[in-house]
């Protein structure tokens, strides 16, 4: 039979009933179930399956490597989806442009820090009535902090933007019609 591993809290009952032949399992059970599965064929996409799970499967089972068709279908966008993606990037680009203009004009006058800069960018995004929330936590790092992967400024690590330092801001917005 088919087993689908997922976060069961996110699967409505009506959805489970629609797929009567599928056994829905909690994702956290995957490793344990794989260790106790023998002489089965698994279809996986080696481009997206973790090496950890692939090795567990191969100990007692065989694998058929098939490219995930959903992965490729996600790459195909309708004209409406493309328009919405473009609109989201244009609207978010307006906020980012205003932010960079604000930094340029206030760099010397005000004490701009990683945190105050991140807050200002959020404030500018919120001026758009279609803005919902951040796509992911904003990464706002200057100097050595700008080189830290997934850096999150705190009161302790918060640095002032200084002339000569590189400033990295990685951010995105979720709008009614799309995300950046």
Model-derived segments and spans:
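Active-site neighborhoods and metal-handling regions in enzymes and metal-associated proteins
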Residues: 1-180
């Amino acid at each position: 039979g088919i087993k689908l591993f997922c976060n069961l809290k996110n699967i409505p009952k009506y959805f489970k009933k629609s797929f009567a032949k599928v056994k829905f399992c909690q994702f956290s059970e995957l490793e344990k179930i794989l260790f106790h599965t023998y002489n089965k064929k698994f279809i996986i996409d080696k481009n997206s399956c973790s090496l950890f799970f692939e090795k567990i499967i191969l100990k007692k089972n065989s694998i058929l490597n098939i490219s995930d068709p959903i992965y490729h279908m996600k790459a195909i966008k309708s004209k409406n989806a493309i328009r919405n993606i473009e609109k989201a990037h244009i609207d978010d680009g307006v906020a980012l442009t205003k932010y960079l203009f604000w930094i340029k004009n206030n760099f010397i006058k005000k004490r701009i820090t990683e945190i105050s800069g991140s807050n200002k960018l959020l404030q500018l995004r919120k001026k758009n009535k279609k803005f919902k929330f951040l796509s992911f936590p904003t990464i706002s790092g200057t100097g050595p902090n700008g080189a830290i992967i997934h850096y999150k400024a705190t009161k302790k690590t918060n640095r002032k933007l200084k002339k000569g330092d590189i400033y990295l801001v990685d951010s995105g917005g979720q709008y009614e019609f799309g995300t950046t």
